[in-house]
C-alpha cells in the first residue's frame, strides 16, 4: 500500500516512520521536539510528530498505539488510549502522551514514542429490528462466559 506522507518539519526526513522488523505491524512514530519534555506523573501533553498522512481511501484508517516498552517500563501510554486517524484527515499526527507512572519521564527529541498501524475499515449500515435471532450468549456480558 502506498501512503501519502507530508513532512511538516524538515528534520523528520532523517526520522521517517519505519517498521522495526519485517514482521512489525506498526510503523514507529517519533517525537518532533526542539528540546526534551519532562512529563510529571499524571501529566498529559500533545506531542507533534512533524508528519501528516492522507489515507484518502475510506476503506482504511490508521491507529496510533502505544509502544509496549514505554508503557511497561515507564508508564508512558496514550492519553486517549488509541488514536484513530480517519481516511479524510490531513492534519499533523499528534500523540496524546500520558505519564501514568510514579516518576517523571523525560521525552527526548526524535525519540520513538508511538506506532502507527494501518487497518481496513467497514462502514456499517443499520437494519432496524424489534428483536434479534436468539444466540447462545444472548445478553450475557461482563464475565458471563466464565473466568477460565
Curated annotation (Swiss-Prot):
Pathway: Pyrimidine metabolism; dUMP biosynthesis; dUMP from dCTP (dUTP route): step 2/2. CDD domains: trimeric_dUTPase. The keyword Transmembrane does not apply. InterPro entries: dUTPase, dUTPase-like, dUTPase-like_sf, dUTPase_trimeric. Its EC number is 3.6.1.23. GO terms for molecular function: dUTP diphosphatase activity; magnesium ion binding. NCBIfam families: dut (TIGR00576), PRK00601.1 (NF001862). This is Deoxyuridine 5'-triphosphate nucleotidohydrolase.
Amino acid at each position: 500500500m502506498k501512503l501519502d506522507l507530508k513532512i511538516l518539519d524538515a528534520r523528520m526526513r532523517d526520522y521517517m516512520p519505519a517498521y522495526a522488523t519485517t514482521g512489525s505491524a506498526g510503523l514507529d512514530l517519533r517525537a518532533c521536539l526542539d528540546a526534551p519534555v519532562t512529563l510529571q506523573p499524571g501529566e498529559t501533553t500533545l506531542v507533534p510528530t512533524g508528519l501528516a498522512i492522507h489515507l484518502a481511501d475510506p476503506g482504511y484508517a490508521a491507529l496510533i498505539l502505544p509502544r509496549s516498552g514505554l508503557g511497561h517500563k515507564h508508564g508512558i501510554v496514550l492519553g486517549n488510549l488509541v488514536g484513530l486517524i480517519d481516511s479524510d484527515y490531513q492534519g499533523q499526527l499528534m500523540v496524546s502522551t500520558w505519564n501514568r507512572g510514579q516518576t517523571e519521564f523525560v521525552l527526548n527529541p526524535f525519540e520513538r514514542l508511538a506506532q502507527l498501524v494501518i487497518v481496513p475499515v467497514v462502514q456499517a449500515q443499520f437494519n432496524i429490528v424489534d428483536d434479534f435471532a436468539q444466540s447462545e450468549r444472548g445478553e450475557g456480558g461482563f464475565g458471563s462466559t466464565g473466568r477460565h
